[in-house]
Amino acid sequence: MKQKILLLSFLFLSLIGHAQPIDWNKKLPADPNVLIGITYYLRHNEEPKDRASFFIIRNAGALLENDDQDGLAHFLEHMAFNGSKNFPGNSMISTLERHGISFGGNLNAYTVYNISDVPMADESLTDTCLLILHDWSYYLTLDPKDIDEERGVITEEWRTRNTSATRIYNQKRPILYKGSKYAERDVIGNLDVIRTFKPETLRDFYHKWYRTDLEAIAIVGDFDIKNMEGKIKKVFSSIPVIPNPEPRPFFEIPSHDKTYFCLATDKEATSSNVQVIRIFRDKEYDGKGYATYQDVKNGLMIGFYNSMVGERIGEIIQRGQAPYVK
């Protein structure tokens, strides 16, 4: 880890020393292609050879839920594998597994739905992966029977996640995100909502926020860019653009002058933990990522700082001179 940090630092400083002077306040260049409301990113990378990864990235999630929808963004992640326009039932999983793409390994969903390490020699498999992204974008079936079956799956997931670490985090969350909607959402959601919501509530949430102007397609790997771009235009041009969509709200964690603190305990906790958390705020951050070159520099420097502190604490532990173990 130390070698990687030093290498990154050297490269970054070398660029500063040998390149033209950098205008740190300059806006970062936009680099998307936009097709009928869908943003897509294509990058050629020869390693690993003849392989690629396919992503659909959502700018939507739990923060957009109303109280009666608490947990539905996470629920939709599960439903992505329970039937769509071109892949009824569990056929999406079985189709990919025939090609060695495993569910949970190469096939996943969170804010980003992805299929990774796809062999590119088989042209039909490429077309299949694009069709899956197409269905994820707008065409999930959301069958009431499948929804009811998934309620139990998510209830069990909640039970297995209900550890001392989770309970301690839930005590800290109102302090960490005080005054923000982040304090109100824990992604997996409210079990009462999960058990009782109506299927149309899930469909309404899906079609309101999971739409083309709030998503992007990203494909990275060893393939011909022009050929892939043509395939994307052919597959995704049929997805309708939502007229007059509701603007996507963004949520900030309010600044505060005084230091907040929290003492969180749980009877099943097996160790004690002390954390110091700082919020670094980019001046022009708009909720969409880094805005300027200075933002990128700040992000790198914060990362270097955190890594250096971790390395030094680790060295103290190795020498047996610390009252802590990690």
Where are these regions (language model features)?
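A structural supersecondary motif
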Residues: A62, G100-S102, I277, N306-K326
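Active-site-adjacent, His/Asp/Glu-enriched structural segments that form or flank metal-binding
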Residues: R58-I168, K181, R185, V193-T196, ...
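Hydrophobic h-region of N-terminal signal peptides that target proteins for export
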Residues: F10-H18
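Active/ligand-binding-proximal structured segments within catalytic/core domains
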Residues: E47-T95, V276, G287-V309
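Histidine-acidic residue clusters that define the catalytic metal-binding segment
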Residues: P21-N33, Y113, E123, Q171-E215, ...
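His/Glu-based metal-binding/catalytic segments typifying zinc-dependent metallopeptidases
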Residues: E46, E246-R312
